[in-house]
Each structure stands twice: as structure tokens, then as C-alpha cells.
């Protein structure tokens, strides 16, 4: 708490001390790191960048699409239904008009299916080096698909991939069962040190 004497400017040394503390706590992180303004993609709901060519997020806006295109993304894959309240009207047309590829794989929230993931993986494998944003409404579906794709196809360590997914959410019973099912199909054990399912 700032000393009230500092506010009256009667003890300048303490003022400088408190200003330095505030700068160290708040200003240093803003000036020495990438701020929100440096990367407009970081404003997208639950945006996470896994590599320079693969990221996932929640619902994007039309303004976000311009920034996504400018960042070098060439393909957008959408995993939710287009009739949801927060869906972007005409997202497919907007994306295509910006010169990016658009793929829509509607995944039922309460019943994700193996074929949904297999279709997604097939799309990714057609051109694995194409910069891609995978998104849904809040990055729950997308973060699970990202986790699975990274573990199965990119051979990312389960602990690392799960840690990234846990930043967004800890999958509920339905989605954990889905994860285990897909991993089992690929002969991958979901166990890892420090992994809690």
C-alpha cells in the first residue's frame, strides 16, 4: 500500500521507493515482454500458439480474421456448429475472401466422435506445414484436438501437450474419455509424470 505521506510529497525518498516497486511489479513485465498490442492475436479468446505454424483459440471476430491473415495463417479449421450464438456470421466467406483456406468440422459438444478427429487429422496431414488456426467457441474442443494431433502426429511429449491444454481447461469426463479412446487407437498410453486426468 502506498504511504499516505508519499501522496503529500513530504517524503520524496519513499515516493521513489514505492514508484520503483510499482514499476518493478507492473511496468517491467509490460516493457520487457511482448505486450498485448505487440500481438493482436493474443486478444482472441483463449488463444494459444503451439508453434509458428499451429495455434488454437476460441471464437474469432471479423477483425481477428484480418490479423490472423496478416500473421501468416493460411488455413482456419472450425470445430463448432455455425448456428451457435457466438458464431461469426459468414465466417467461411470472410475467411475465403481473405485468401485463406476454410474447413468446417462440426463437433457435437456432448458427443465428440472418432471420425471428427480423423477428419481433422486428415486435413492437417494434407499439408502439415501450412500455418493453421484451429478454433471453436471457447477453445475447449480445439485444445483437445490440438493435444491429440500434437501427441500423435507431431510426437510432442504428453506432459508438455497436456500442460498446454490445461492452460485452457481440464477436460470433463466426456472429453477425457474421448482423449483416451483416440490415444488407445494409436497405441499411446495417456499416463505421464505429473499428469492428472
Can you annotate each of these PLM segments?
Residues 139:
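Substrate/cofactor-recognition hotspot
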Residues 4-19:
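Bacterial N-terminal signal peptides that target proteins for export
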Residues 6, 30-132, 144-197:
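Cys-dependent protein tyrosine phosphatase-like superfamily
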Residues 135:
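Short, surface-exposed ligand- or partner-binding patches at beta-edge/loop junctions that are enriched
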Residues 17-27:
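Bacterial N-terminal signal peptides
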Residues 12, 27-31:
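Intrinsic disorder/low-complexity segments in short proteins, especially the signal peptide
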Amino acid at each position: 500500500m502506498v504511504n499516505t505521506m508519499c501522496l503529500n510529497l513530504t517524503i520524496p525518498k519513499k515516493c521513489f521507493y514505492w514508484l520503483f516497486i510499482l514499476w518493478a511489479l507492473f511496468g517491467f513485465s509490460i516493457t520487457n515482454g511482448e505486450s498485448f498490442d505487440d500481438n493482436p492475436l493474443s486478444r482472441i479468446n483463449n488463444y494459444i500458439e503451439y508453434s509458428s505454424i499451429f495455434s488454437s483459440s476460441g471464437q474469432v471476430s471479423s477483425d481477428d480474421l484480418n490479423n490472423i491473415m496478416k500473421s501468416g495463417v493460411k488455413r482456419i479449421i472450425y470445430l463448432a456448429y455455425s448456428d451457435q450464438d457466438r458464431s461469426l456470421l459468414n465466417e467461411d466467406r470472410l475467411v475465403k475472401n481473405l485468401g485463406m483456406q476454410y474447413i468446417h468440422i462440426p463437433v457435437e459438444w456432448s458427443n465428440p466422435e472418432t471420425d471428427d478427429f480423423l477428419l481433422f487429422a486428415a486435413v492437417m496431414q494434407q499439408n502439415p506445414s501450412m500455418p493453421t488456426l484451429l478454433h471453436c467457441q471457447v477453445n475447449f474442443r480445439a485444445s483437445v484436438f490440438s493435444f491429440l494431433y500434437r501427441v500423435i502426429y507431431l510426437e510432442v511429449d504428453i506432459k508438455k501437450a497436456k500442460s498446454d491444454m490445461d492452460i485452457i481447461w481440464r477436460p470433463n469426463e466426456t472429453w477425457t474419455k474421448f482423449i483416451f479412446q483416440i490415444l488407445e487407437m494409436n497405441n499411446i498410453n495417456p499416463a505421464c509424470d505429473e499428469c492428472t486426468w
